[in-house]
């Protein structure tokens, strides 16, 4: 069963380092096939992040624990990104305008 997950990294981060980290960490997860090997592709240039899609295959989708394998892979990559100093930015929004608040007095 093929799994996909997109990791977002900062525009200032090293794409090659991030791709290498993704492949290494996912390859080390128990239940991920070595053939075909995990791979990555840069798929998005978003508002706040460069999207790198990972693709990997798990060995036995009938076991019903493919969600556990996917979770382990994503967690391993996140921890590696933290260790390497690779940023996983989130969208920043700025709200503009006014809010008028009238004080109410009453009994």
Identify the residue ranges that each predicted region occupies.
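Solvent-exposed, non-transmembrane regulatory segments of membrane-associated proteins
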Residues: 9-13, 35-107
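Soluble accessory domains appended to multi-pass membrane transport proteins
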Residues: 1-34
